[in-house]
């Protein structure tokens, strides 16, 4: 019985990335647009099955979402396919709370619903 995918701290993630690990954001598009960890690639959880081939199986991958649920699912799915997949502890929220850099400069980590509302207001997303 598994306890879930390995979890890495922010410091461990920074070290892994410096050593060549891939950083993948599995949040939705509107969350990605609000702010993301510098250097991350975007692969929403909903598209993981179709796009997993975009991830290099020969390098570790650190996945993150807002707080950990989606990155847990993504890491478990990738690990089942033979990837060295880990999830970032506390997600992008923990990253931002520590004052670590986000893109674009001044990016934010709003609540999921709040992010969508802000983007609707800014007319970046069509109204639903």
Map each language-model feature to its residues.
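Short, surface-exposed ligand- or partner-binding patches at beta-edge/loop junctions that are enriched
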Residues: 63-65
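Rhodanese-like catalytic fold shared by cysteine-dependent sulfurtransferases
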Residues: 1-22, 28-60, 69-128
């Amino acid at each position: 019985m598994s306890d879930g995918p390995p979890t890495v701290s922010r410091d461990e993630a920074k070290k892994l990335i410096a050593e060549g690990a891939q950083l993948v954001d599995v949040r939705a598009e509107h969350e990605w647009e609000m702010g993301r960890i510098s250097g991350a690639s975007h692969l929403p959880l909903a598209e993981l099955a179709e796009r997993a081939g975009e991830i290099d199986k020969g390098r570790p991958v650190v996945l993150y979402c807002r707080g950990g649920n989606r990155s847990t699912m993504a890491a478990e799915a990738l690990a089942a396919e033979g990837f060295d997949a880990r999830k970032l502890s506390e997600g992008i929220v923990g990253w931002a709370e520590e004052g670590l850099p986000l893109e674009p400069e001044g990016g934010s980590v709003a609540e999921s619903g709040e992010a969508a509302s802000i983007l609707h207001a800014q007319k970046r997303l069509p109204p639903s």
